[in-house]
C-alpha cells in the first residue's frame, strides 16, 4: 500500500494545477469540510463553503462550529509559515480556537476547566475499550509526544512521514487532552505538521468515520498504530485517485 501511495502522490504533485491557488483552496475546503463532518457535525457543503469564503458565520451553533474550525485552521496555516514548533501552548491554542464560540466552563469532581480556553480536561475519562490517560499525566505525556514528533519529522523522508503522523494522532487520541474536540484538534495538528513540511494535506473522509474510530481503538498508547497508518494511507490513495 505504501508504494501505491508514493506512486500516486508523485503523479498528483506533478499535475500542473496542484500548485495553483484555486486548487489549493479547493483541497483546503474539502479537508475542512470532511474534518467538520468527522467531528459529528453536518452542514450542506454550500453553506460551509460560504462560511469559509466570507469568514462570516450564521447565528446557529453548527455554523459557529464551522466558523471556529475555519479560524483554527487559518491559525495553523499562519503558524506553519512561521515554523512554529509543535508544543503544548500551540496545541492548546488550536483547541481553544475550535471551541471558541461553543465551549465553556466544565465542572468535574476534581475542579473546573474551560474548553473555550484550551484547558486540559480534569477528571478521568474512560472509553468502552480502553481507559484514557490519567488527567494528571496529560501535560507530561503530551509534551513528550510533541517533542518526539518534532525530532522525528526533521529527520524523516516521505516514506516515514505517514508513520510518524499516524503515531502522533494515535497517541494524541489515547491521551485525550481535552474534554471536547479531540478528533478535530488531532486532525488539524497532523495537517499543520504536513503543511510545515510542505507535504499535501491529509484528507480523511467522513464517510469512513467508523473505520477511523476503529483504527484509533486498536492497541494501547505508544504501540505502533499499524491499523491507523494503513487507514491514512488508504484515505490518501482514495483522494489521489479522485484527483488524478
Where are these regions (language model features)?
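FIC/Doc superfamily catalytic core
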Residues: 1-244
